[in-house]
Amino acid sequence: MGKEIKKVVLAYSGGLDTSVILKWIAKTYDCEVVTLTADLGQEEDLDGVDEKALRTGATRAYVEDLREEFARDFIFPMMRACAIYEGRYLLGTSIARPLITRRLVEIAHAEGAQAVAHGATGKGNDQVRFELASAALDPSLKVIAPWREWDFRSRTDLLNFAAENDIPVISAGNRKLYSMDRNMLHCSFEGGELEDPWNEPGPGSYIMAVPVEQAPDEPEYITIDFEKGNAVAINGQAMSPAAIIKTLNTLGGKHGVGRLDMVENRFVGMKSRGVYETPGGTVLHAAHRDLEGICLDREALHLRDSLIPRYAAAVYNGFWYSPEREALQALVDKTQENVTGTVRVKLYKGNVVPVGRKSPYSLYRMDLATFEEDEVYNQADAAGFIRLNSLRIQGYGRRS
């Protein structure tokens, strides 16, 4: 087992799990371990994480700022598609995995490694996402998933291994209440009291957004400018994709926007309960959707909308690097060519309320839509339209 693998590239956070994994792989496979720590805007202090990896046994430690790449090449394409899983989840965890895996594979090539490794458990979706992405990018690389191989079954087992191997960890008394995953788009919470779907999430699950009870009593109005479906400015100030997300996180989070508590269907077959905070993404999704209302032709909009579940499932299930997702993206991006304009949004007590929109490509005609007297639309013409559309269903209601 260990002879064929001489070097492994590990997705490394610096926490207990991946620190134990680093040492376990080095010992079990008798190989070199190179680590990758990706800054995806998770708001964690990554200073010293490379030194910790090296002290734990890594031969080289990469710490990379991938925030702009993450926002530009992964979040924004998904937002253009209005992707939302099971009608509710904005895919904050799912969309991060393809980028991390791509860098793992690229580093593996640069380092001459034979395998990549991750710390996802054998019960969740992330193992699938990492490994499908790796297979798509380089099927010759082996993927090591320690949670499916080793005998450890609890946090205590990991702590004991860490103590035996001089791996520095935080004390057990400081452990988090939940299993958490955070990046610039969202923060997710699972486990603990959340495993009972009847329990209300506790105060420890509020990191990016305040409880609505604590949100300001006055609404806040903002404007978001879009070009070809991508947000480019907030309140008239041009910003990079990552800065757009970060700014909207601050604005939305202050007003309690973007909280979601749901039971979802995992790709691996079980249901799981998760609590998600996606303040900036929720604001962006609502504003973009609203602008499409005046910019997109009806049939193009309806066609794209019919494909939202397919696109969202591709992201959720780990098929970012797939012919179907790329084909869907091509259709989506065609629809976005004229989604350019400005949306005015009101933020208040957990709500995102679009209250105004304008676009140089607007298909909305006030002279046609008016309820006042007009000289453009002959209302009598509607009679023939209705008559022709009734032919197919005439008498249908009498069949039963």
Curated annotation (Swiss-Prot):
This is Argininosuccinate synthase. InterPro entries: Arginosuc_syn_C, Arginosuc_syn_N, Arginosuc_synth, Arginosuc_synth_CS, Arginosuc_synth_type_1_subfam, AS_cat/multimer_dom_body, Rossmann-like_a/b/a_fold. It is found in: Cytoplasm. Gene3D superfamilies: Argininosuccinate synthetase, chain A, domain 2, HUPs. It holds the Pfam family Arginosuc_synth. CDD domains: ASS. Pathway: Amino-acid biosynthesis; L-arginine biosynthesis; L-arginine from L-ornithine and carbamoyl phosphate: step 2/3. It catalyses: L-citrulline + L-aspartate + ATP = 2-(N(omega)-L-arginino)succinate + AMP + diphosphate + H(+). GO terms for cellular component: cytoplasm. ATP binds at residues 11-19, 38, 119. It comes from the Bacteria. One of its GO terms (molecular function) is ATP binding. Homotetramer. Keywords: Amino-acid biosynthesis, Arginine biosynthesis, ATP-binding, Cytoplasm, Ligase, Nucleotide-binding. L-aspartate binds at residues 121, 125-126. Belongs to the argininosuccinate synthase family. Type 1 subfamily. Coiled coil: none annotated. L-citrulline binds at residues 89, 94, 125, 129, 179, 188, 264, 276. GO terms for biological process: argininosuccinate metabolic process; L-arginine biosynthetic process; urea cycle. Its EC number is 6.3.4.5. PROSITE patterns: ARGININOSUCCIN_SYN_1, ARGININOSUCCIN_SYN_2.
